Amino acid sequence: MGGGQKGLESAIVCLLVLGLVLEQVQVEGVDCGANPFKVACFNSCLLGPSTVFQCADFCACRLPAGLASVRSSDEPNAIEYCSLGCRSSVCDNMINTADNSTEEMKLYVKRCGVACDSFCKGDTLLASLDD
């Protein structure tokens, strides 16, 4: 198995892990109650460029205390530490387990970092492997 194939597999695993984490935030994190219109509003809002925070406010859904506290005055620090933790646990694992000398692998690691930044800022979109 070549280094490029191994890098691609690592990138896919990275995106799958981030997708699972994002799914947990969406399912367990935001409470729109039993109102199907609020749920539909929130889910359709997430399809656009809006953040979880913006969609929750717009659709009158409640964020849990832990997620809502990210919007406090320490938000830049919280985002920075979240991104740093994500990169060190997910993206660095890609570097350590694959041949990171290829240009393709460097691109995957960079996109993993972008995905971590998007996740930590509350965005629900992950970096695409297709540009």
From Swiss-Prot:
GO terms for molecular function: toxin activity. Belongs to the plant thionin (TC 1.C.44) family. Thionins are small plant proteins which are toxic to animal cells. They seem to exert their toxic effect at the level of the cell membrane. Their precise function is not known. The keyword Disulfide bond applies. Developing endosperm. Residues 67-131 form a propeptide. Its main location: secreted. One of its GO terms (biological process) is defense response. It is found in: Secreted. Residues 1-29 form the signal peptide. It comes from the Eukaryota. This is Type-5 thionin. Is disulfide-linked. InterPro entries: Thionin. One of its GO terms (cellular component) is extracellular region. Keywords: Disulfide bond, Plant defense, Secreted, Signal, Toxin. The gene is TTHV.
